[in-house]
Amino acid sequence: MKKRLLWRGIDAEVHEVSLGQNFNPNDYDIFFIGGGQDFEQSVLLKDLKGEKGKNIIKAIEDEKVFLAICGGYQMLGQYYKTWDGKQCDFLGALNLYTVGEKKRLIGDFSFKLDE
């Protein structure tokens, strides 16, 4: 993403926010949230239960821009239910949920929200 901005003459700084590290959402213009396997998501979810999660919700409520891929967008939603019925509660910042199936769906998605 940084490289694409630089190609367009837009200067950008990238700040990584690690596990256990909080951030001020007012200090950022855009947020990127990647994904991971179920175990890695469970580790991250523990980290999101505190101030970091509240700050992500605040950034969404303040209409900040997010690019969330893979499990990143799932973690912004209400919950993820695995194909075998286990439910993982997520941030609830967005009114969406994910239900897994035995056969995984992999590819690009596009969503349109009703206002």
Whereabouts are the PLM-identified features?
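Short acidic, glycine-rich loop/turn motifs
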Residues: 5-7, 112-115
